[in-house]
Design a protein with these regions (language model features):
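Canonical tetratricopeptide repeat
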Residues: 63, 97, 131-135
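Residue-level recognition of tetratricopeptide repeat
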Residues: 57, 91, 125-126
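Terminal, low-structured helical/coil segments at or just beyond the last alpha-helical repeat
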Residues: 112-150
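Structural marker of alpha-solenoid helical repeat scaffolds
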Residues: 53, 87, 120-124
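Canonical positions in the second alpha-helix
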Residues: 50, 83-84, 117-118
Length: 150
């Protein structure tokens, strides 16, 4: 009888653990589907819930940043991008999004630093970096000219 109870307990534990790992994956996948359907508030809730179960999931932070970008909350967007990069320093999409924010803030030094990192890790979005660097070239001389006239 004692062995039988242990077997039942072990079975319940195994089922419980497997359903927990399934739910972790399910939160992200369900959130991603909601994000694609532009249901950002619901998606944000599930991405945040996924982070509770899987705090080292850089993609959840990346998609939270994308949601905050849509909502024009740059502070939260930047925070989530920085967190995604702490977890995955080679996340080219997070690097690219941070470069765009730095460019928007006229933080050209940060754009250059991020661009140097981006060039080392880019696989799919390499052309985007060229566009950012080109716009940086067009802006910097104007800034230098205005400073020299002062």
């Amino acid at each position: 009888m004692n062995k039988f109870l242990k077997l039942i307990g072990l079975t319940l534990l195994t089922v419980s653990l497997s359903s927990t790992s399934f739910s972790k994956e399910n939160f992200f996948n369900e959130a991603l589907e909601l994000f694609k359907k532009e249901k950002y508030e619901d998606a944000r809730f599930l991405f945040e819930r996924n982070i509770v179960f899987n705090p080292k999931d850089a993609n959840s932070y990346l998609y939270l940043a994308k949601i905050y970008n849509k909502e024009e909350d740059q502070r939260k967007e930047e925070y989530n991008l920085e967190t995604a990069l702490l977890i995955d320093p080679n996340n080219e999409e997070a690097l690219l999004m941070l470069m765009k924010i730095a460019l928007e803030k006229s933080n050209y030094e940060k754009v250059k630093d991020l661009s140097d990192k981006f060039v080392k890790v880019c696989k799919n979005l390499c052309d985007e970096n060229k566009g950012i660097l080109e716009s940086l070239k067009n802006i910097e001389p104007k800034n230098n000219e205005s400073w020299s006239k002062s």
